[in-house]
């Protein structure tokens, strides 16, 4: 039997790294999410502000994988908080490159905010749990995320 091409093997390896039970999806405007992995979708409902708090088991960190966003900067954006609601805002994002962020604890919060009259632009964010210990791959740090805030009020 002939083996698959190297690119196919790489694709299968990548799929294995991100595999999981993706039946946990949140299309609601906010809430507390547990038991990763999961996927957050924004809502086009009447709510202007949505807050999702992700809590994973103790001795784990929350990892957020954010594909490139295409939000209307100045009218809508996503805030990342390193901890529960009320924690320090570590970044505001409305567009740009993909980001992967690892929280400093087992809690992270995502806020989606938009101005009145602004229709919600679709986006999604993946969340995972990562055990405490050395980083397994590079994550964006606070300074990198702040650099994406230039056009956000």
UniProtKB/Swiss-Prot annotation:
Residues 1-20 form the signal peptide. It holds the Pfam family CUB. Residues 93-130 are annotated as: Heparin-binding. Keywords: Acetylation, Disulfide bond, Fertilization, Heparin-binding, Secreted, Signal. The modification N-acetylalanine is found at residue 21. It comes from the Eukaryota. One of its GO terms (cellular component) is extracellular region. Disulfide bonds join 29-50, 73-94. GO terms for molecular function: heparin binding. One of its GO terms (biological process) is single fertilization. Partial N-acetylation differentiates isoforms AWN-1 (not acetylated) and AWN-2 (acetylated). InterPro entries: CUB_dom (IPR000859), Sperma_CUB_dom_sf (IPR035914), Spermadhesin (IPR000124). Its main location: secreted. Residues 29-130 form the CUB domain. CDD domains: CUB (cd00041). It is found in: Secreted. PROSITE patterns: CUB (PS01180), SPERMADHESIN_1 (PS00985), SPERMADHESIN_2 (PS00986). Belongs to the spermadhesin family. AWN proteins mediate the binding of boar spermatozoa to component(s) of the egg's zona pellucida by a carbohydrate-binding mechanism. Awn proteins are secretory components of the male accessory glands being coated to the sperm surface at the time of ejaculation. They possess as well heparin-, serine-protease-inhibitor-binding capability. This is Carbohydrate-binding protein AWN.
